[in-house]
Amino acid sequence: MEAPRGWLVIMISVLAVSLASSAAQDTCRDLDGRDGAARKPGRPGRPGPKGERGEPGAPAFQTGIRGLKGDQGESGSPGKPGRMGYPGPSGPPGLPGLPGLKGIKGNPGNIKDQRRPAFSAVRQNPPTSGNVVIFDEVITNQEGAYKSQLGQFICDVPGYYYFTFQVVSKWDLCLYIMSSRRDQVQQSLGFCDFNSKGLFQVVSGGTVLQLQRGDKVWIQRDPNKGRIYQGSEADSVFSGFLIFPST
């Protein structure tokens, strides 16, 4: 491209001034000339290289309207297993299990080691007051469960017992086999005999009772029909024994 004439004139002027200045330095400095006339700006130069990245700017204030919620993104990859939590509350009981196998047969028991309470007592010189029939003369009292002063059997071995009585009378007579637990009456079995001729008759009765430790058993008479014969001609007896213990 051919350079404009204006540029050539300027370049020749600058070159002449430089040569004159150089010649003056060898001899003596002359007075500076006047500034040249101002010219029009030249054309823009070519773009320079890309500059370095600047510092981040301050956060801008949100001025626009908030847009709509976007679509749900894809699920991320599973995270690592967490720590074991605290034990939870106990669940409900499970169903009963299947019956176990039959155990090995045990050694035979020793009948001598088994307790076998039993008693039998008759009336000889009992007290006349009260409604409890006292059988004061003991015939047998295995393990001492019968208390002759009270007329009561007090259970010490839980199980099933058989009790029986035979009482002689010449009058109308009603008797009861009584049992109590913690001083509360549990059973009351009545047996009556009506005697209009005044002859010797025997009133008898018996029963099987399941007893726990501390239960009491005795014979009790009706206050209005409770006269018992007392003499050497006939005896009245009260007996009882353990049939088998409770398991």
From Swiss-Prot:
Disulfide bonds join 174-192. GO terms for cellular component: collagen trimer; extracellular region. O-linked glycans are assumed to be the Glc-Gal disaccharides typically found as secondary modifications of hydroxylated lysines in collagen-like domains. Core component of the complement C1 complex, a multiprotein complex that initiates the classical pathway of the complement system, a cascade of proteins that leads to phagocytosis and breakdown of pathogens and signaling that strengthens the adaptive immune system. Core component of the complement C1 complex, a calcium-dependent complex composed of 1 molecule of the C1Q subcomplex, 2 molecules of C1R and 2 molecules of C1S. The C1Q subcomplex is composed 18 subunits: 3 chains of C1QA, C1QB, and C1QC trimerize to form 6 collagen-like triple helices connected to six globular ligand-recognition modules (C1q domain). Interacts with CR1 (via Sushi 24 and Sushi 25 domains). Interacts (via C-terminus) with CD33; this interaction activates CD33 inhibitory motifs. Residues 27-38 have a biased composition (Basic and acidic residues). Residues 112-247 form the C1q domain. This is Complement C1q subcomponent subunit A. PROSITE patterns: C1Q. Residues 33-111 form the Collagen-like domain. The modification 4-hydroxyproline is found at residues 41, 47, 56, 59, 81, 87. The keyword Calcium applies. Gene3D superfamilies: 2.60.120.40. Residues 1-24 form the signal peptide. Residues 98-109 have a biased composition (Low complexity). Residues 26-116 are annotated as: Disordered. GO terms for biological process: complement activation, classical pathway; innate immune response. Its main location: secreted. The lineage of its organism: Eukaryota, Metazoa, Chordata, Craniata, Vertebrata. SMART domains: C1Q. It is found in: Secreted; Cell surface. Keywords: Calcium, Collagen, Complement pathway, Disulfide bond, Glycoprotein, Hydroxylation, Immunity, Innate immunity, Metal-binding, Repeat, Secreted, Signal. It holds the Pfam family C1q. The modification 5-hydroxylysine is found at residues 50, 69, 102.
